């Protein structure tokens, strides 16, 4: 009995694909909507998966036991920032010192000021780098954020105390200015109209939010030096709080309590600053990807609906064209279930072919994006491929039911007489 059923299933599949091959152009036009729907889902999924992988790597490089304190909301977010946030008072290095002193679960606190200058270029000889990200940091910043040096040293307490004109630069900065010269440590550069000496170069960092890690474009200087170079442009301070091993939740609560008291926040008021951890930043990004994913699903659903309606229409046309064939099969003993099965398999084979084409195109597009836009990470997840193919089969099953039932309901006598 089992071999007979297996043979019947193979015959049904063979007939389905023979029908598709006999009407190749019509079949291709019919599944276009399915192709687009699957293509959109898989491509968007691949981009979001690649971006998530990179942001997890970048955040975890800074340390999974670190807390990031800032007066504005941090982490990836959709939409414009609330303007009320810009009225908040920035944090100060003294706030970090208080957290370190008063929070028992905090091991160390570093601070970093972002230097917002019109001219961010740094020059050496005839070379100039204009994409530098300028930050004035404490001497312990490298230890707290797990930064590694390729050569030279990091900034010291003495550099900060004496406001020395020294810099530590990222991988991209060093390659642009000193690539042909080899070593960068000890060389003089000009920045903000002043001479500075490079004392260290950072190791190349792993991928960031859009592929490239911004730390590769970094230029660090001592915090007090930064206050001289840009006295008004260095007010925004980020505190990086390192919790003791296994005490991150306690450190988070203690740091929040200390900062709320220092900033005069009442018990019934929300905090006028933001505390983030690696897990929170990843959760924020996951929320964004979920929203983008819903939009992609909505777009692909429209395409799949259009494709499904097209499949249903073409299958109804096929029922009309093959009325006599259906009559012959019924006269030879085919049951209603056999006719339903045949037309359902044809509909699912049609939409599955569209799903396969959509997946193959999506893989090609993802690889092309990696070549043309390296900063836009793309990694096709296996679940997206499986989901795309499964949905395409489901579309054929749903929209093939009516034509299949209509074919099965034909009277064999009337079908044989159909012209």
Go through each PLM region and give its residues:
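Hydrophobic, regular-secondary-structure patches
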Residues: 49-133, 140-143, 175-176, 227-228, ...
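Transmembrane alpha-helical interface segments in multi-pass membrane proteins
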Residues: 12, 17, 21, 25, ...
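Transmembrane helix-loop junction
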Residues: 53, 175-176, 363, 367, ...
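Generic structural signal for small/hydrophobic residues in well-ordered secondary structure
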Residues: 23, 51, 69, 99, ...
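Mid-to-C-terminal secondary-structure elements
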Residues: 123, 132-159, 163-267
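Peri-transmembrane interface segments
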Residues: 252-255, 266-300
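Short cytosolic juxtamembrane segments of multi-pass membrane proteins
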Residues: 404-419
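Short, membrane-interfacial amphipathic segments enriched in basic
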Residues: 1-14
């Amino acid at each position: 009995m089992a071999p007979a059923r297996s043979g019947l299933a193979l015959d049904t599949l063979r007939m389905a694909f023979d029908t598709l091959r006999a009407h190749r152009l019509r079949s291709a036009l019919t599944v276009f909507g399915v192709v687009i729907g699957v293509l959109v889902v898989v491509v968007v999924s691949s981009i979001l998966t690649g971006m998530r992988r990179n942001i997890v790597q970048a955040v975890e490089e800074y340390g999974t036991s670190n807390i990031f304190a800032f007066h504005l909301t941090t982490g990836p977010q959709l939409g414009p920032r609330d303007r009320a946030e810009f009225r908040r008072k920035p944090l100060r290095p003294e706030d970090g010192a208080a957290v370190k002193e008063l929070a028992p679960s905090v091991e160390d606190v570093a601070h970093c000021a972002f230097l917002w200058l019109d001219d961010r270029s740094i020059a050496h000889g005839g070379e100039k780098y204009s994409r530098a990200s300028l930050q004035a940091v404490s001497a312990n910043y490298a230890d707290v954020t797990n930064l590694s040096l390729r050569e030279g040293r990091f900034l010291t307490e003495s550099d900060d105390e004496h406001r020395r004109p020294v810099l530590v630069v990222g991988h991209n900065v060093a390659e642009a200015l000193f690539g042909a010269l080899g070593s960068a440590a000890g060389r003089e550069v000009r920045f903000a109209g002043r001479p500075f000496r490079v004392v260290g170069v950072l190791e190349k960092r792993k991928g960031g939010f859009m592929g490239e890690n911004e730390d590769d474009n970094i230029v660090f200087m001592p915090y007090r030096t930064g206050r001289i170079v840009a006295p008004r442009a260095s007010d925004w301070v980020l505190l990086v709080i390192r919790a003791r091993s296994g005490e991150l939740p306690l450190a988070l609560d203690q740091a929040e309590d200390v900062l709320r008291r220092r900033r005069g926040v009442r018990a019934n008021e929300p905090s006028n600053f933001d505390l983030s951890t690696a897990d929170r930043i990843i959760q924020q990004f996951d929320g964004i990807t979920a929203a983008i994913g819903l939009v992609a699903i909505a777009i692909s659903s429209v395409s799949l609906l259009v494709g499904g309606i097209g499949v249903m229409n073409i299958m109804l046309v096929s029922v009309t064209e093959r009325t006599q064939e259906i009559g012959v099969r019924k006269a030879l003993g085919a049951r209603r279930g056999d006719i339903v099965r045949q037309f359902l398999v044809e509909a699912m084979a049609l939409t599955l072919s569209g799903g396969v084409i959509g997946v193959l195109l999506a893989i090609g597009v993802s690889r092309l994006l990696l070549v043309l836009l390296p900063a836009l990470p793309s990694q096709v997840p296996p679940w997206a491929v499986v989901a795309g193919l499964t949905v395409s089969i489901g579309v054929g099953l749903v929209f093939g039911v009516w034509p299949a039932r209509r074919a099965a309901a034909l009277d064999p006598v009337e079908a044989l007489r159909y012209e």
